[in-house]
């Protein structure tokens, strides 16, 4: 009983320490966000890495998700003679929920791991210490450009993913489910509201912030050795994915 209590207390203290480190890390990002110098080259490099190079995986995932969603909604709607709801539900479901969440998870798997591994390797090989020696703030040089790039790039990816997902539903709806092309498009557009699109883009910005902060945070606290880099990469992806799902719930409820 005493051992169990001690272990529980130790886990609680470790959790408090972790949360405290994360809060301090976020505060350091905020204090360096708008303070010169601005490393534009690192920023544009991060835009390409996070946005452009993530486009194929987000596009492919969204297309097949939209197609599968159309098939499932049609199968369910056919039981109640409500097949006509397929276009509108596919559009709303992709734009409000599935597009942002799946896009965020795909980017988290690709980008959070990449950021954590890159910064973790720099930490292990003492390149971060070299930046400090050269009077360069590591947060300013390594973290801030990636955070800003992710906050700007992920909503764009979400918007593109939404469009491709709706296109996937359209292709399946018109080729496999015998929907009329014009009617499918009209029903998809008519039931979408501006807030549906805006809420998905807001989620994308929040998810981008989560992905970049988690990747940078675990990379900066990486322990020595290859094992430490692997652990940092795993922790970044898992934490970012869990936080994305949690944030999605609260943003949907708000």
Predicted features and spans:
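Short, membrane-interfacial amphipathic segments enriched in basic
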Residues: 1-41, 218-219, 223
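A hydrophobic alpha-helix feature that marks transmembrane segments and, especially
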Residues: 105-123
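Short cytoplasmic-facing helical segments at TM-TM junctions of multi-pass membrane proteins
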Residues: 119-144, 226-229
């Amino acid at each position: 009983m005493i051992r169990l209590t001690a272990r529980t207390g130790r886990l609680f203290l470790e959790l408090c320490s972790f949360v405290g480190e994360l809060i301090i890390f976020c505060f350091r990002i905020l204090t360096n966000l708008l303070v010169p110098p601005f490393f534009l080259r690192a920023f544009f490099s991060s835009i390409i890495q996070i946005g452009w190079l993530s486009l194929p995986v987000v596009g492919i995932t969204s297309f097949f998700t939209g197609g599968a969603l159309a098939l499932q909604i049609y199968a369910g709607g056919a039981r109640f003679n409500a097949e006509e709801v397929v276009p509108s539900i596919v559009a709303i479901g992709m734009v409000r929920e599935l597009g942002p969440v799946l896009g965020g998870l795909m980017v988290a798997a690709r980008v959070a791991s990449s950021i954590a591994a890159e910064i973790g390797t720099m930490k292990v090989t003492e390149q971060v210490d070299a930046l400090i020696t050269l009077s360069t703030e590591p947060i300013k040089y390594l973290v801030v450009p990636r955070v800003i790039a992710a906050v700007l790039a992920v909503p764009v990816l979400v918007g593109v993913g939404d469009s491709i997902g709706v296109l996937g539903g359209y292709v399946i709806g018109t080729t496999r489910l015998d929907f009329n092309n014009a009617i499918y498009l009209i029903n998809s557009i008519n039931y979408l509201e501006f807030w549906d699109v805006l809420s998905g883009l807001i989620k994308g910005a929040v998810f981008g912030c989560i992905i970049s902060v988690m990747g940078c945070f675990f990379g900066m606290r990486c322990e020595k050795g290859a094992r430490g880099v692997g652990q940092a990469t795993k922790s970044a992806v898992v934490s970012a994915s869990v936080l994305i799902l949690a944030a999605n719930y609260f943003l949907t409820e708000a």
